[in-house]
Amino acid sequence: MSRTSTSRYWSAVVGALTPYVPGEQPKLANLVKLNTNENPYGPSPRVLEALRGEVGDTLRLYPDPNSDRLRAAIAAYHAVSPDQVFVGNGSDEVLAHTFLALLKHERPVFFPDITYSFYPVYCGLYGIAHRAIPLDDAFEIRVDDYLAPKGGVIFPNPNAPTGRLLALGEIERLLAANRDSVVVIDEAYVDFGGDSAVPLVARHPQLLVTRTLSKSHALAGLRVGYAVGQAPLIEALNRVKDSFNSYPLDRFAQAGALASIEDRAYFESICARVIATRTRLVDAMESLGFEVLPSAANFIFARHPAHDGEALAARLRERSIIVRHFKNPARIAPFLRITVGTDAQCDALVDALKALC
């Protein structure tokens, strides 16, 4: 049946939604895939061992609804208590619960105009008023733009897709000016060059920090994310979770995430490799005439003064190299967001760009 003949059964909310568009997951082999910010090095061997250990009769049983062992490990890692940790199916689910539990108020929630594009989707889904605050000319967040009364603030740090980092001192200034509304720092990429805001949680009851194991822990396929905040904020998230899905993390996700959190040496080693490759990639791109924004993430955001971003992405694809291009907002249409892959993948990209530029 056509969409026209079936959409009459939709709710008004669904009809008005503009859903999030995920990055492409191509089925073709032998591609240089640099479009969705996955970690190129794979999870810790301990993760694979833990996953194998979950194969058995216990799969007939429901998993721990509260992920107690995983929450305890995350709490130990961040030097907080387990009741300050919430876990979910990727940070996207954690963020969705956060919007409903903590950011749905009469006043609008503020976030940057160039940022993670799921934020306005959540607002549309839950009927949350929002205001997109323009980044400055250097694509940076200006804290002074977030000081007016509001229903909350959320932004990634480093920001996505720009990769730019807001210093902790500026975050503290933002918190000082927003004592009566929740401030959410989305730290999906912070392990690649930023300082976490988690230590600020002890002094700021309105602060919630969300994180994911998809990027720095190379576990995008398991879907594990979490939030750290003072206990009342975590209780609010749990109330939403238990009204939606009381068993969000399956046995494999809990076991794999626990093993990854506990293997700190492996985690630190792959982050260091990504950071080193990023430095090489930035130098190579700049030598080809690209402007590359300063990045504290596992991707770079770059444009060439003589080449259209969309056309360049298409020509790279013809050479079996996939990067991410955003048509909107128009201000970032000249840019390409390029995941930092292995040295070999990035060398292949640079060689292709030498031929194209």
Curated annotation (Swiss-Prot):
Lineage top rank: taxon: Bacteria
Requisite cofactors: pyridoxal 5'-phosphate
Pathway entry: Amino-acid biosynthesis; L-histidine biosynthesis; L-histidine from 5-phospho-alpha-D-ribose 1-diphosphate: step 7/9
EC main group: transferase
Residue positions, PTM N6-(pyridoxal phosphate)lysine: 215
EC number(s) reported in the record: 2.6.1.9
Example GO molecular function: pyridoxal phosphate binding
Keyword Metal-binding: no
Catalytically driven reaction(s): L-histidinol phosphate + 2-oxoglutarate = 3-(imidazol-4-yl)-2-oxopropyl phosphate + L-glutamate
GO biological process: L-histidine biosynthetic process
Keywords: Amino-acid biosynthesis, Aminotransferase, Histidine biosynthesis, Pyridoxal phosphate, Transferase
Family according to the record: Belongs to the class-II pyridoxal-phosphate-dependent aminotransferase family. Histidinol-phosphate aminotransferase subfamily.
Subunit structure: Homodimer.
The name this protein goes by in its record: Histidinol-phosphate aminotransferase 2
Native organism: Thiobacillus denitrificans (strain ATCC 25259 / T1)
UniProt gene name: hisC2
